[in-house]
Amino acid sequence: MTAEPTNPERADRAKQLLVTYAIREMRMDELLSADTAETLLTDLLADFMHFAAQKNMDFQNCCDMAEMHFEAETGEEGDTP
């Protein structure tokens, strides 16, 4: 059984995904900018919405569950959202 990832590890996984997405979008050099990272995240979430629709999944329910996980995880480690 593997240990649960820490919140910094979770954030790093998200960053790695955004880097991969940025490379695909040819905007890797701009990823350091908070504005560009936010745009990439927005684009990625929109793509996930398309994926969810294609699979007949409730995207908003997934977001709600993700928010509950985030709140529980930040509470566990004493992080501030």
Which functions belong to the PLM regions below?
Residues M1-P5, E71-P81:
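Short intrinsically disordered terminal tails
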Residues M1-T39:
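N-terminal acidic leader/helix
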Residues T20-R24, D47, F51, K55, ...:
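Surface-exposed polar/charged interaction patches
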Residues T36-D64:
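An amphipathic alpha-helical micro-motif enriched in hydrophobic residues
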Residues D58, M65-G75:
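Amphipathic alpha-helical binding modules
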